[in-house]
């Protein structure tokens, strides 16, 4: 049974989320502020965190940043419609996804299921390692190496890079990446792809001065992994 930490300071949202999560056979933990969320996350090591941005003590952005420095636990951010900059920042610092309030509980449950599946199985369709020039990905071990240096990737980042590697040299549209990596009909914009690519390039940069030459932006279309890099 997966354990999910729900972090929100609104009792009505806490009650609705815990009811629906437990109805779907998840174990739930609750925190009403950012400080308490960090304490519980460190002690209980949950499988997923649903994290509101607007929190007392520490806001969700700060909590997400701290958690991402300490672990790769999947994080779904809850945001208000007028918090676009916070949504982008949350994705850039490592949140796996976001849901805008007021949200459909059915939509959120679908995302929870998908994010957990990705985290637990890495969402890859082959256990065979892939090598594209100086990049090697081993899905069975969840290991990635670039220029013979190990990369520390979250499940989402690994899936994204693996998907691009399986289609090396081919342009993947943002919609195709959403479908194959995120794994559901996405209700928001395609910005999650762009911010995930940005994070991925940041980690590739640790092994290369020019990560953008490996994951290439095809303006107006999407991205591709350069098979000649």
Segments (PLM) and residue ranges:
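Active-site residues of response regulator receiver
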Residues: 8, 52, 79
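Hydrophobic residue at a beta-alpha junction
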Residues: 31-32, 40, 55-58, 85
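Short hydrophobic/Thr-rich beta-strand motif most characteristic of the beta2 strand and flanking loop
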Residues: 6, 25-32, 36, 40
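Charged docking surfaces used in two-component/phosphorelay signaling
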Residues: 12-23
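Short, Lys/Arg-enriched segments at the junction into DNA-binding effector domains
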Residues: 2-3, 114-171, 175, 209, ...
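His-Asp phosphorelay/catalytic-motif detector in bacterial-type signaling
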Residues: 45-47, 70-75, 187
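Basic, amphipathic DNA-recognition helix from helix-turn-helix-like DNA-binding domains
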Residues: 59-61, 65-69, 74-131, 202
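Active-site beta3 strand of CheY-like receiver
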Residues: 44-50, 55
């Amino acid at each position: 049974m997966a354990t999910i930490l729900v972090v929100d300071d609104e009792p009505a949202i806490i009650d609705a989320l815990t009811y629906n999560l437990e109805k779907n056979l998840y174990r739930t933990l609750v925190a009403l502020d950012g400080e308490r969320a960090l304490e519980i996350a460190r002690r209980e090591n949950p499988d997923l965190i649903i994290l509101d941005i607007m929190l007392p003590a520490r806001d969700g952005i700060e909590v997400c940043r701290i958690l991402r420095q300490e672990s790769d636990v999947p994080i779904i951010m809850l945001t208000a419609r007028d918090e676009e900059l916070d949504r982008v920042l949350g994705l850039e610092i490592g949140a796996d996804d976001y849901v805008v309030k007021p949200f459909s509980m059915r939509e959120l449950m679908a995302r929870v299921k998908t994010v957990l599946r990705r985290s637990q199985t890495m969402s890859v369709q082959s256990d065979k390692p892939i090598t594209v020039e100086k990049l090697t990905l081993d899905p069975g071990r969840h290991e990635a190496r670039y220029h013979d240096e190990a990369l520390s990737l979250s499940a989402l980042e690994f899936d994204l890079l693996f998907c691009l590697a399986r289609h090396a040299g081919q342009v993947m549209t943002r919609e195709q990446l959403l479908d194959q990596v995120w794994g559901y009909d996405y209700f928001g914009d395609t910005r999650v792809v762009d911010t995930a690519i940005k994070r991925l390039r940041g980690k590739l940069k640790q092994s290369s001065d020019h990560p953008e030459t490996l994951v290439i932006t095809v303006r107006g279309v999407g991205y591709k992994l350069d098979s000649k890099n």
